[in-house]
From Swiss-Prot:
It comes from the Eukaryota. The keyword Glycoprotein applies. Its EC number is 4.6.1.18. Keywords: Disulfide bond, Endonuclease, Glycoprotein, Hydrolase, Lyase, Nuclease, Secreted, Signal. It catalyses: an [RNA] containing cytidine + H2O = an [RNA]-3'-cytidine-3'-phosphate + a 5'-hydroxy-ribonucleotide-3'-[RNA]; an [RNA] containing uridine + H2O = an [RNA]-3'-uridine-3'-phosphate + a 5'-hydroxy-ribonucleotide-3'-[RNA]. This is Ribonuclease pancreatic. Endonuclease that catalyzes the cleavage of RNA on the 3' side of pyrimidine nucleotides. Acts on single-stranded and double-stranded RNA.
Length: 156
């Protein structure tokens, strides 16, 4: 009797373990939309000419762990305004994909570029505040930015 119960419960246990193994890795994984927000949206501050802004933000936003991310752009606009770019002018992405959008108006941004000779773990960045149109790749439901593609000057 005990053996029969074990044989019935064994497949159920195997099924539960398979489901947990499949679901668990995605539980702690950051979504592409959340990663975009972490890496590119800084609504709480305005563009800073402080030479330490990029050094601090790149560390704070975990972009200097294991390597120095060479280039990054922070957008200093409300998150909803950045998300709304997904419904503005459709443009072709740098990689040829068709899911990029250009902001209708220029936005306040800060470009961070790794300085020449800077090596991990001592990542040092040059800070450049600007006002430019942003181009982002969007996907998902809701349709939101998942990749910062470029910034461009006003063409007027």
């Amino acid at each position: 009797m005990a053996l029969e119960k074990s044989l019935v419960l064994l497949p159920l246990l195997v099924l539960i373990l398979l489901v947990l193994g499949w679901v668990q890795p995605s539980l702690g994984k950051e979504s592409r939309a959340k990663k975009f927000q972490r890496q590119h949206v800084d609504s709480d501050s305005s563009p800073s000419s402080s030479s330490t802004y990029c050094n601090q933000m790149m560390r704070r936003r975990n972009m200097t762990q294991g390597r120095c991310k060479p280039v990054n752009t922070f957008v200093h606009e409300p998150l909803v305004d950045v998300q709304n770019v997904c419904f503005q002018e459709k443009v072709t992405c740098k990689n040829g994909q068709g899911n990029c959008y250009k902001s209708n108006s220029s936005m306040r941004i800060t470009d961070c570029r790794l300085t020449n000779g800077s090596r991990y773990p001592n990542c040092a960045y040059r800070t450049s505040p600007k006002e430019r149109h942003i181009i982002v790749a969007c996907e998902g439901s809701p349709y939101v930015p998942v990749h910062f593609d470029a910034s461009v000057e006003d063409s007027t």
